[in-house]
């Protein structure tokens, strides 16, 4: 029997969530899921929830939860609501009792070794390794005997053995015959919960309208839809995006520490560059720098996500970070400049941003224009530079000052091209390349410029 998932009425304000397990640092692949959810919610005026799936007490750590919250704030997508599953055990226990009462949750007593033996025998007979539901045949006396032997049951959800269908936001029409699946264990023998049941309970309680996650959860979806319905709820819309892989085809994992968001942040990668790469790779859009998260949100479209793996090359991030800085408006940089003690306002930022590979380099350019420094003055250029210094106009200086000054220096010295510009740049900055001198001169001021042209520290 086939039955499509009942659909919710389209809400005016969608609710989406990102649900990491705090068992390690999140990487750029996790960021892809978080960003797609957050930006879809933001664009529609909806709610973005951060849910920590921390029911595995042995592996979950508070410091990882804190790091994840820090990473989302760095990306510019702080959640509207945050909660931990470990604070909601009572709700999961209530759902467990409801499923037991309706006959959908049943106790099973096999050990892992016994289950593995069953699977090996099934494979030897060319049968799929699906749980045989032997526990359903146990009598009350059988269960009492097993428990007297010290066995404690784990609890399985009895699937309907039907075809579950849904319209996936990325993959289109999907269907899974749950007869091909083992009845999933929802509660371990020690009473702790696996991922599946708490996720459904929370999505119902929080009014989640859309679940957008990696394609490795496609099969889970059919199981979860049955649990939604068994609890008397309506399943949200589902969308399963492609996963990021390295150019080699290797999948991303938490063990690749250099791709964690904290490592990328410490390496000086721009959050907006990381966001653009995470969201746009593996879509119909080119991976390019964007001016803002709002601009990136406008490019998020589930229909534009490819079904093929998304190849992510970490080496491309450096160039994307540079391009992001080159187009970053002053308003986006202002607070960071102030925090670093960098002045000069919009004039300074527009002068130097095109020469930045990392934001931290702005401090070097600020030191160059605001603090004493010695330029590079060749002995053969001293006369020329002295003439140039003598032709410096009085202040105040503006954007036209440099052009007028160069015109006068060229006329007086007869120099042109590299012979004109190169000695001036070396004397003023000590560097072969850099921002336009026309923009730097007003920031440096007449006294500093004259001093460096004279070969001094100014």
Swiss-Prot record:
Pfam families to which the protein is assigned, alphabetical: Anticodon_2, tRNA-synt_1c
Highest rank taxon of the organism: Bacteria
Catalytic activity: tRNA(Glu) + L-glutamate + ATP = L-glutamyl-tRNA(Glu) + AMP + diphosphate
Gene3D superfamilies noted in UniProt: 1.10.10.350, HUPs
Organism name: Xanthobacter autotrophicus (strain ATCC BAA-1158 / Py2)
UniProt protein name: Glutamate--tRNA ligase 2
Top EC group: ligase
SUPFAM superfamilies: An anticodon-binding domain of class I aminoacyl-tRNA synthetases, Nucleotidylyl transferase
Functional summary from the UniProt entry: Catalyzes the attachment of glutamate to tRNA(Glu) in a two-step reaction: glutamate is first activated by ATP to form Glu-AMP and then transferred to the acceptor end of tRNA(Glu).
GO cellular component: cytoplasm
Motif ('HIGH' region): 20-30
Location, primary (coarse class): cytoplasm
Motif 'KMSKS' region: where in chain: 251-255
InterPro entries xrefs: aa-tRNA-synth_I_cd-bd, aa-tRNA-synth_I_codon-bd_sub2, aa-tRNA-synth_I_CS, aa_tRNA-synth_I_cd-bd_sf, Glu-tRNA-ligase_bac/mito, Glu/Gln-tRNA-synth, Glu/Gln-tRNA-synth_Ib_cat-dom, GluQ/Sye
Key words of the record: Aminoacyl-tRNA synthetase, ATP-binding, Cytoplasm, Ligase, Nucleotide-binding, Protein biosynthesis
GO molecular function, one term: glutamate-tRNA ligase activity
């Amino acid at each position: 029997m086939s039955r499509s998932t009942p659909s919710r009425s389209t809400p005016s304000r969608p609710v989406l969530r990102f649900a990491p397990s705090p068992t390690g640092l999140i990487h750029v692949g996790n960021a892809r899921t978080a960003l797609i959810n957050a930006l879809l919610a933001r664009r529609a005026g909806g709610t973005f929830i951060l849910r920590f799936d921390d029911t595995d007490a042995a592996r979950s750590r508070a410091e990882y939860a804190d790091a994840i919250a820090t990473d989302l704030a760095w990306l510019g997508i702080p959640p509207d609501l945050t909660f931990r599953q470990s604070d909601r055990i009572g709700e999961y226990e209530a759902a467990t009792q409801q499923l037991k009462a309706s006959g959908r949750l049943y106790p099973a007593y096999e050990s892992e070794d016994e289950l593995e033996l069953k699977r090996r025998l099934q494979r030897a007979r060319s049968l799929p390794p699906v749980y045989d539901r032997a526990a359903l045949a146990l009598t009350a006396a059988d269960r009492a005997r097993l428990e007297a032997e010290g066995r404690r049951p784990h609890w399985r959800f009895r699937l309907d053995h039907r075809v579950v269908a849904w319209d996936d936001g990325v993959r289109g029409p999907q269907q899974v015959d749950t007869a091909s699946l083992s009845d999933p264990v929802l509660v371990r023998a020690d009473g702790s919960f696996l991922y599946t049941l708490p996720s459904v309970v929370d999505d119902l309680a929080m009014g989640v309208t859309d679940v957008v996650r990696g394609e490795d959860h496609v099969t889970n979806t059919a199981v979860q839809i049955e649990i939604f319905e068994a609890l008397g709820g309506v399943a949200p819309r589902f969308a399963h995006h492609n996963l990021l892989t390295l150019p080699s085809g290797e999948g991303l994992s938490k063990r690749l520490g250099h791709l964690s968001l904290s490592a990328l942040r410490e390496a000086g990668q721009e959050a907006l560059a990381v966001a653009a790469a995470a969201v746009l790779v593996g879509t119909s859009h080119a991976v390019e720098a964007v001016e803002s998260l709002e601009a990136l949100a406008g490019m998020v479209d589930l229909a534009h996500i490819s079904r093929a793996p998304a190849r992510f090359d970490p080496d491309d991030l450096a160039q994307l970070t540079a391009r992001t800085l080159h187009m970053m408006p002053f308003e986006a940089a202002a607070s960071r400049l102030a925090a670093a003690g960098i002045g000069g306002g919009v004039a300074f930022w527009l002068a130097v941003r095109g020469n930045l590979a990392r934001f931290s380099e702005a401090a070097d350019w600020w030191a160059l224009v605001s603090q004493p420094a010695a330029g590079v003055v060749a002995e053969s250029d001293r006369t020329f530079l002295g003439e140039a210094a003598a032709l410096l106009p009085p202040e105040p200086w503006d954007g036209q000052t440099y052009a007028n000054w160069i015109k006068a220096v060229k006329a007086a010295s007869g120099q042109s091209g590299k012979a004109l510009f190169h000695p001036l740049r070396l004397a003023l900055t000590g560097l072969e390349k850099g921002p336009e001198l026309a923009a730097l001169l007003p920031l440096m001021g007449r006294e500093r410029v004259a001093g460096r042209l004279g070969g001094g520290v100014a």
